[in-house]
A protein has these predicted regions:
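Helix-loop element at the rim of GNAT/NAT acetyltransferase active sites that forms part
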Residues: 6
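Short, conserved catalytic or interaction motifs in soluble domains
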Residues: 39, 75, 137
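NAD(P)H dinucleotide-binding glycine-rich loop of Rossmann-like/cofactor-binding domains
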Residues: 23, 43, 49-114, 147
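Glycine-rich beta-strand-centered segment in the early N-terminal region that forms part
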Residues: 1-3, 13-57
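Terminal peptide-recognition signature
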Residues: 34, 63, 92, 125, ...
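A glycine-rich helix->loop->beta "capping" turn
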Residues: 167-173
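Mid-domain Rossmann-like dinucleotide-binding core that forms the NAD(H)/NADP(H) cofactor-binding site
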Residues: 83-159, 164
C-alpha cells in the first residue's frame, strides 16, 4: 500500500524535485511485508510488516527502504492505514520529540492543528502526556483538534492566539509547519 501526500502531488506537478538518486517512481510512504533484507540489517526480517518513509518508489510493487526509515505496523492497522503514517509521524517525532525534546506535562502549541502534521502532533503529544493547544482557521477545524485531544483549540481568525496561549500559561514548544 502507498500513501499519497502533498510532496507526492508537488513532485508530480514538477514543483518539488526528488532527492538526488531517488527512484523516478513517485511515492514517499509505503507499507508492506519485508521480502528481503540487506547484509547487516538486524532490525527487520523477511515476513515483518512495516511502513516506511522513502526517497521515492512507494507506488511500485516493490520498494527499497533504509532499516532506520521503517516502523512496525501497529496492531489493528491495515496496510492501507499504515501507509499514511510515515511522513507525519516521523516529521512530528523529529521536530517535537527529538529536536525540541517535549516532555510529559509540558505544553505544545500546534499551528495548523487540523492538517496532517497537526492532527498527528496533537495525538502523539497527548499520548506522551503533554498539554496541547492547537490553532485552526474555522470552528469546524477547532472542534476536530479538540476531538483529537487538544486541550484548547484556537480559531486564529476570531481569537488572538498569542493572548489565549499566554493566558493559559504559555507553551514550552511550538510546532509551526504551516
Amino acid at each position: 500500500a502507498a500513501g499519497v501526500n502533498r510532496p507526492d502531488l508537488m513532485q508530480r506537478a514538477g514543483l518539488y524535485p526528488p532527492p538526488p538518486g531517488a527512484p523516478v517512481t513517485l511515492g514517499l510512504e509505503a507499507a508492506g511485508e519485508v521480502v528481503e533484507v540487506g547484509s547487516g540489517v538486524t532490525r527487520w526480517h523477511v515476513g515483518d510488516k512495516v511502513t516506511a518513509l522513502l526517497a521515492g518508489g512507494g507506488y511500485a510493487e516493490y520498494a527499497l527502504a533504509h532499516e532506520g526509515a521503517a516502523l512496525p505496523i501497529p496492531a489493528g492497522l491495515s496496510m492501507i492505514e499504515a501507509a499514511a503514517l510515515p511522513e507525519t509521524v516521523m516529521t512530528v517525532w523529529a521536530n517535537v520529540f527529538e529536536s525540541a525534546a517535549l516532555k510529559p506535562n509540558e505544553t505544545l502549541l500546534v499551528h495548523g492543528g487540523a492538517s496532517g502534521i497537526g492532527t498527528t502532533a496533537i495525538q502523539m503529544a497527548r499520548a506522551f502526556g503533554a498539554r496541547v493547544f492547537a490553532t485552526a482557521g474555522d470552528a469546524e477545524k477547532v472542534k476536530l483538534c479538540e476531538k483529537l485531544g487538544a486541550h484548547r483549540g484556537i480559531n486564529y481568525r476570531t481569537e488572538d492566539f498569542e493572548t489565549v496561549v499566554r493566558d493559559l500559561g504559555g507553551a514550552d514548544v511550538v510546532l509551526d509547519m504551516v
